[in-house]
From Swiss-Prot:
Native organism: Chlorobium luteolum (strain DSM 273 / BCRC 81028 / 2530) (Pelodictyon luteolum)
NCBIfam families associated with the record: hisF (TIGR00735)
Compartments where found: Cytoplasm
Domain of life, per lineage: Bacteria
CDD domains listed in its UniProt record: HisF
Keyword ATP-binding in record: no
Name of the molecule in the record: Imidazole glycerol phosphate synthase subunit HisF
Taxonomic classification: Bacteria, Pseudomonadati, Chlorobiota, Chlorobiia, Chlorobiales
Molecular function via GO: imidazoleglycerol-phosphate synthase activity; lyase activity
GO biological process: L-histidine biosynthetic process
Subunit structure: Heterodimer of HisH and HisF.
């Protein structure tokens, strides 16, 4: 059985790590480099760097920040925010990213997924899907969750898989920052329908929530921010907790 992954996420805005609730009310969560170094030494399996305002404000992810982070970590680094072309993806890879995460641009131009995958391989393409429950349906949103789309979550997940995505980063906007646990219903819906890895995101507030994301949501990886950024729990502690309960992790 493949080991389940624990992935801390650096939501970056104006050169700082931030964290909000339901994509709003951002508060400072520290220095980008300090957090990156910390997670590199904490047995994180990967690190995600998301410039959360890049697409919203139509500006590009700061390549200098990506370069600094990539020089500090020796674990796979996924970078997202404002990646709207193959050339932009190339720049991010040249600055040290191992994977790129596309979201808003992929909904606008789905073929972007295929073009990046054809050039760099599916393993280098993560499609971030932000969903919100609307009238009982999971609706995909873009522009940092500000704009609803015509896509339902399952429909879009199957489409991005077909287009060549190597992973799906599924974020519940309803749970984001709430520490109430992942939306395991939507996770299970997507995880059991696709054959590519699904990363759980949005709502982790305890070690039990990580466990539930793997066992109830059938996620392949768990992304978290609040519980790690503010040192509520360590990644080592989380992995030991999971291992003690029969989940295969790297320790």
């Amino acid at each position: 059985m493949l080991a389940k992954r624990i992935i801390p996420c650096l939501d970056v805005r104006d050169g700082r790590v931030v964290k909000g609730i339901n994509f709003e009310g951002l508060r400072d969560a520290g220095s980008i480099l300090e957090q990156a170094r910390f997670y590199n030494n904490e047995l994180a399996d990967e690190l995600v760097f998301l410039d959360i305002s890049a697409s919203l404000e139509s500006r590009r992810t700061t390549l200098e920040e990506v370069l600094k982070v990539s020089g500090e970590v020796f674990i796979p680094l996924t970078v997202g925010g404002g990646i709207n072309s193959v050339e932009r993806a190339r720049e991010v890879f040249l600055h040290g990213a191992d994977k790129v995460s596309v979201n808003t641009a992929a909904v606008k131009e789905p073929e972007l997924i295929s073009r990046i995958a054809e050039k760099y391989g599916s393993q280098a393409v993560v499609v971030a899907i932000d969903i919100k429950k609307v009238d009982g349906r999971y609706i995909v949103h873009t522009h940092s969750g500000k704009q609803p789309t015509a896509y339902e979550a399952l429909e879009w997940a199957l489409k991005v898989q077909e287009l060549g995505a190597g992973e799906i980063l599924l974020t519940s906007m309803d749970r984001d920052g709430t520490k109430e646990g992942y939306d395991n219903d939507s996770l299970a819906l997507i995880s059991t329908a696709v054959h590519i890895p699904v990363i759980a995101s949005g709502g982790a507030g305890s070690l039990e929530h990580l466990y539930d994301g793997f066992t109830k949501g059938h996620a392949d990886a768990a992304l978290a921010a609040s519980i790690f950024h503010f040192r509520q729990h360590s990644i080592r502690e989380a992995k030991q907790y999971l291992r003690d309960r029969g989940i295969t992790v790297r320790l």
